[in-house]
Amino acid sequence: MAAAGALTILAAGAPEATDASMPMLEVMGRRVWRYGSTAAAASLAKISVNYLIAHALQALAESITLLERGGLDTGQFVEMINDSVFPGPVYGGYGEAIARRAYTPPGFTTVLGLKDVMLAVDAADDAGARLPCAPVLREVFETAVSQVGADLDWAAVAEVTRGRSRLSWW
């Protein structure tokens, strides 16, 4: 993605250093987002993005499981949401993976997803913030790592919800 200039870059650091890095960053990324003077700020933003994706994966898992239990075409559903309310790589790409149960090769593994959920929990604790859905996400990701596959794409967390709805993929 860097060679294609398609990365989303979160930059942080001393303004002079960030300014000096901008020409290189702009070549690698389609957009550079500045997050202040500390690397911790950019890290927190990245953790928050991945925490949001974890929520999206679980929402997709639940919606697709509901459709499967109702006998509907999940591929058409994913195409519809990607064309209307949720265009983009998260709902479109991961939605398709979940609908097709295509979790290899992984772009980001379930074990890395669990790590990022826990990083969000730790960051929230440090900031005094509450993440009410975090215990559910943690449990789903822990189950995915131990019972579905630690090295599968993190979209495979959908199989936890499917399994609990008696739609096993094994």
Language model features with spans:
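Rossmann-fold dinucleotide-binding core
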Residues: 1-51
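Hydrophobic alpha-helical segments
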Residues: 19, 165-170
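Secondary-structure boundary/capping signal
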Residues: 29-32, 131, 169
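Helical "substrate-binding/catalytic lid" subdomain
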Residues: 41-164
